[in-house]
From Swiss-Prot:
Family: Belongs to the UPF0181 family.
HAMAP family (alphabetical): UPF0181
Composition skew (Acidic residues), residue ranges: 55-67
Organism from which the protein derives: Klebsiella pneumoniae (strain 342)
Protein name, UniProt field: UPF0181 protein KPK_1966
Organismal lineage: Bacteria, Pseudomonadati, Pseudomonadota, Gammaproteobacteria, Enterobacterales
Lineage: superkingdom: Bacteria
Amino acid sequence: MFAGLPSLSHEQQQKAVERIHELMAQGMSSGQAIALVAEELRATHTGEQIVARFEDEDEDQDEDEDD
């Protein structure tokens, strides 16, 4: 799967991590916190985008089991 992701500086990445930790400290699950911060970043980011490829490890394991 390919996805367009915001290209973030180290400082922006650090702020995102801190925001995730704040949300988790308030009782939000890690998955929800990550999703919310990702949504916020996509909505407000005006810089460059990078393309990333994600591979589903489960699919690879399923294929290995079929052999």
